[in-house]
Every structure is written in structure tokens, then in C-alpha cells.
Amino acid sequence: MKKIKEAEQRKIRRKKRIKDKIGRGIATRPRITIFKSNRYFYAQVIDDSKGHTVASISTIEKSLNLSKNIDDIKKLGEVLAKRLKEKNINNLIFDRNGYKYHGLIASFATSLREFGINI
């Protein structure tokens, strides 16, 4: 039980440290935030000045029919990059939401970069 609490505390500290560094998203450079559940992967692009979600994507979308593995997360990044290009958004602030930058998070970010989104 103690190890679980310590892991949660570390995640909370990482999350606070990240928020302090990246600041808030604006209309010209919105913030992309990530959430991972045990089954699904979610990403949403947020304009913090208005408090609106500009674009979002997840593995739960039936039209995409994707699972939570690295290959499908790369496809998810590709689809989100296309959606952002349609809305003329090329620059983002990447908020990894306290998750370590490896595995799914890293592959999602590199996928966005490969398709022309500056993070």
C-alpha cells in the first residue's frame, strides 16, 4: 500500500512540475493533453484562453477501430495531425499530464512531429 501511495505522490509532483513549466495554451499555440486509462488512450487539444477543446481523439472512437498499442497510437497521432492541419494549427504545447515520456506517450508525440505538428 505504501508503494502505491508513493507512486501516486511522484505522479502528482511530476504533473505539478510539468504544469509550472509549460504554462497555458493560447489560440495561436494550444495545449495538447494526454490521458491513459487501462483500456483507452485519449488526447485533446485545448485553448486555455477560451476554455474550449479545439480537437480531440481517442482509441474509443468506433470509426478508427484502434487499440492501445504503439502501432495504433502512431495512427492516432496521424489522424489528429490531419484534423489539426484542417484547422490550421501547426504549433502545440505538449502536456504529458504526469506520464513519463516513453512508450505510448513518446510514440504519439513523434507521430505528431512526423506529420508536421511542432511540439
Curated annotation (Swiss-Prot):
InterPro entries per UniProt: Ribosomal_uL18_bac-type, Ribosomal_uL18_bac/euk
Keyword DNA-binding: no
Role noted for this protein: This is one of the proteins that bind and probably mediate the attachment of the 5S RNA into the large ribosomal subunit, where it forms part of the central protuberance.
Name used for this protein in its record: Large ribosomal subunit protein uL18
Biological processes, Gene Ontology terms: translation
A single cellular component GO annotation: cytosolic large ribosomal subunit
NCBIfam families, sorted: L18_bact
Source organism (scientific name): Borreliella afzelii (strain PKo)
Superkingdom of the organism of origin: Bacteria
GO molecular function list: 5S rRNA binding; structural constituent of ribosome
Record family assignment: Belongs to the universal ribosomal protein uL18 family.
HAMAP family: Ribosomal_uL18_B
Record note on quaternary structure: Part of the 50S ribosomal subunit; part of the 5S rRNA/L5/L18/L25 subcomplex. Contacts the 5S and 23S rRNAs.
Alphabetical keyword list: Ribonucleoprotein, Ribosomal protein, RNA-binding, rRNA-binding
